[in-house]
């Protein structure tokens, strides 16, 4: 049966929706198998998690033991330790004899985890929330020493996604993770993050605690020819072919973020009866905006008046000099501090981003909503 959803957005994509990134995938999988750590920097919705997961699958297929931990929901050291230790035992250490070996392994972790065994034999570890003041960094280090022993038998890779959250938990936690990497030099750690200013502070700026701890991989936009070929190919498989001009228009209106391109492509597909042309793309943009209009309105209403006016200004076109007198006059503010606060609020809410030396609205659908004055 032909698919009614040839494109995918909103969550990490599987192999069938993976558009390009083959060179990055080959590099990442090779480093995982080779025991070399990698630091992945990517703006949000650029396919970071999809790439990392595909790299883990490729490394596992080549015989590596792999694990994946998402730190986004961690707000304390205990939660970070629980997430990392769980990933280690559920991934690289999960072998047929794990249950037999489990007691001895857990004795080596200075904070004893709780243990649950699922019906399929999967082991779920945790730390009691009542245990407040414990050496959580030491517990992670203990687990990493066990992981290093496993790396003596086969390649081992552990991906720590949304790694920027480490900076939000506390100032010293990045040093704990550096010690972890030092404890297991033969393990490939993949530190992947999307808030670039935080990731740079953790990994690449002078004095960063994790500076030089892995090979840097920066994800940029998918090249337009590769994205066009993907859009056309997917539409043909689903029985509503998109012509190349329409595919290029999708990228022009929604790019450069792959997630946004796929969202618009799917909306254009939804409006088409047979062939997807430029008219379908324009109607698809209107449809995508209307589907998100309530969310846009809620986010807009939470902003201060100055931030609202600045966001509308950015929707009209990129602004290279936001502190210029003409900009402040248009925003009806008396000094650049008000502009600075508004930009900080828009950046924190991920509504505005600075690329190519200028500020602009981060979301193409929000930009269209602002320009059209939609309710």
PLM features per residue range, with description:
Residues 1-38, 43:
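A short, basic N-terminal segment
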Residues 200-252, 273-275:
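Helix-loop-helix "sensor" segment of P-loop NTPases
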Residues 126-195, 204-206:
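Conserved Walker B catalytic segment
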Residues 37, 42-46, 50-156:
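P-loop NTPase nucleotide-binding core
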Residues 347-357:
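A short, conserved structural fragment
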Residues 262-334:
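Winged-helix-like regulatory helical subdomains adjacent to P-loop NTPase cores
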Residues 331-348:
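Short amphipathic alpha-helical interaction segments
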Residues 365-375:
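Short, amphipathic alpha-helical interaction segments positioned at domain boundaries
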